[in-house]
Amino acid sequence: MAFKYWFVFAAVLYARQWLSTKCEVPQMTSSSAPDLEEEDDYTAYAPLTCYFTNSTLGLLAPPNCSVLCNSTTTWFNETSPNNASCLLTVDFLTQDAILQENQPYNCSVGHCDNGTCAGPPRHAQCW
């Protein structure tokens, strides 16, 4: 009878050892652990602001057809495509109005052609 208990005891120990090797969770080492300190780079999705002149004909690019833009991390110039509307000239009689925010002034509108604002001019109100 003692032999039966010894046999059952040995079988239980063997089963326990077998289960502990098959079911153990592998421990992470420093080389296999994910780097929780690293942050994702979301700058590509950051809000982008570009600065145009507003007019009765729509938004106008600057005379050099290179629009100043910025995101939360960087400033850059974005070249306007050919035939985009651009600010050709400003009426010098209303130049003082430009210094006052949201005051309309007379301006001439052209179109971008290889990085420069070209005519024929169209007249508009700008602000």
Curated annotation (Swiss-Prot):
Effect of W127A: No effect on binding to CCL5
Subcellular location: Secreted
Leader sequence residues: 1-23
Gene Ontology CC annotations of this record: extracellular region
Gene Ontology terms describing biological process: negative regulation of chemokine activity
Effect recorded for N54A: No effect on binding to CCL5
Protein name: Evasin-4
Organism of provenance: Rhipicephalus sanguineus (Brown dog tick)
Source lineage: Eukaryota, Metazoa, Ecdysozoa, Arthropoda, Chelicerata
